[in-house]
Amino acid sequence: MDHLKKYITEINDYPKKGIVFKDLNPIYKEPKAWKELMFPLQNLISTKKPDYIAGIESRGFISASALAFKLEIGLITIRKPNKLPGEVIGTNYKLEYGEDRLEIQQNIIEKDSKILLFDDLLATGGTAGAAGKLIKKAGGNLIGYAFLVELTELKGRENLDSNLLVETLIKY
């Protein structure tokens, strides 16, 4: 999958000084490149038989919704604060460049439903780790994590449940 790196733009000092942001938008506008990423994920995820894919705001929504549609399973959105109606469950966490909070609707997850967590990029693992804890807090059974890109030098896998699947397709 390394040949697909040519579609990933690097933007220095975004969103904060010292960060090199990996912009995946060019992949989404190239159907063949996006398809090449999505098919292996679709095949892998289908073997795990999740009830839902949970996508993390906002870039995780793009591929998570496409995968959920293709696999004919539900999509759960994990959002930043104050973006969801009704009662929510939330958790605070640390980012590579600060702190943030994630929330889901209180009754959106059926108890013990199998959920695969998806985001576009694994960096420090802070966001995905927090989202995984949130899924469990809401009563879901987290069965694994999938990402398009992993920044290996940041060792994000160390902040995820090591007993679960962690799949990434492009590594830096």
From Swiss-Prot:
Its EC number is 2.4.2.7. It is an enzyme of class 2 (transferase). The keyword Transferase applies. GO terms for cellular component: cytoplasm. CDD domains: PRTases_typeI. The keyword Cell cycle does not apply. Pathway: Purine metabolism; AMP biosynthesis via salvage pathway; AMP from adenine: step 1/1. It catalyses: AMP + diphosphate = 5-phospho-alpha-D-ribose 1-diphosphate + adenine. Keywords: Cytoplasm, Glycosyltransferase, Purine salvage, Transferase. GO terms for molecular function: adenine binding; adenine phosphoribosyltransferase activity; AMP binding. Homodimer. Catalyzes a salvage reaction resulting in the formation of AMP, that is energically less costly than de novo synthesis. This is Adenine phosphoribosyltransferase. It comes from Prochlorococcus marinus (strain NATL1A). The gene is apt.
